[in-house]
Curated annotation (Swiss-Prot):
GO annotation, biological process: FMN biosynthetic process; riboflavin biosynthetic process
Enzyme class: transferase
Enzyme Commission code: 2.7.1.161
HAMAP family in alphabetical order: Riboflavin_kinase
Any one GO MF annotation of this record: magnesium ion binding
Domain of life, per lineage: Archaea
This protein's name: Riboflavin kinase
Annotated CDP binding sites: 13-18, 111-114
Known cofactor(s): Mg(2+)
Family recorded in the similarity comment: Belongs to the archaeal riboflavin kinase family.
Pathway given in the UniProt record: Cofactor biosynthesis; FMN biosynthesis; FMN from riboflavin (CTP route): step 1/1
Length: 132
C-alpha cells in the first residue's frame, strides 16, 4: 500500500499522551516491539485528513488492548507503522476514544521525536504509512 507522503503541522496536545502511553507501555512494547517514549507527537494534517483516513482504513493496523485498571474506562488503540522524515520510524496511534478530530495524527516512537527531528510547534513534518 502506497498512499504517498503526508505533511502535518506540529502542535502541543493536551498533555494526555504521556499519561496514556505510560499506562499502555507494556502492551505497546509487546505489540510494537519497542518501548515508546512517554508521549505522542501531535500533527494536524488539515485537508489531507480524508485521504489519510482512507489509507488508514485500508492499512493493517495492530490492535492494542487496554490494561485492566479497576475504575478506569480505557479503550483499544490501533497502531499503524509510519516513517517520519529523516528515516525515523514509529506508529500512528488511533485510540478508539479520543478528544481529537480526524485531522489530528498522534505518533509514538522509541525516541523523543521533537528532539530527534529538532522540531517545535508550528513546524511541518512529513511522514508516510508503511506496510506492516
Amino acid at each position: 500500500m502506497d498512499c504517498g507522503v503526508f505533511e502535518g503541522t506540529v502542535f502541543s496536545g493536551l498533555g494526555h499522551g504521556s499519561f496514556y502511553v505510560s499506562i499502555y507501555a507494556r502492551n505497546l512494547r509487546r505489540a510494537l516491539g519497542y518501548t515508546p517514549y512517554p508521549g505522542t507527537l501531535n500533527l494536524r494534517v488539515g485537508d489531507a485528513a480524508e485521504r489519510l483516513a482512507g489509507c488508514i482504513e485500508r492499512a493493517r493496523g495492530v490492535r492494542i488492548e487496554p490494561p485492566p485498571i479497576p475504575g478506569e474506562r480505557l479503550a483499544s488503540v490501533l497502531a499503524f507503522p509510519v516513517e517520519i522524515e529523516g528515516g525515523v520510524r514509529g506508529h500512528i496511534v488511533r485510540p478508539e476514544i479520543t478528544v481529537y478530530k480526524g485531522d489530528v495524527v498522534e505518533i509514538v516512537a522509541d525516541v523523543y521525536l521533537r528532539d530527534v527531528l529538532k522540531i517545535s510547534d508550528g513546524d511541518k513534518v512529513r511522514f508516510r504509512l508503511l506496510d506492516p
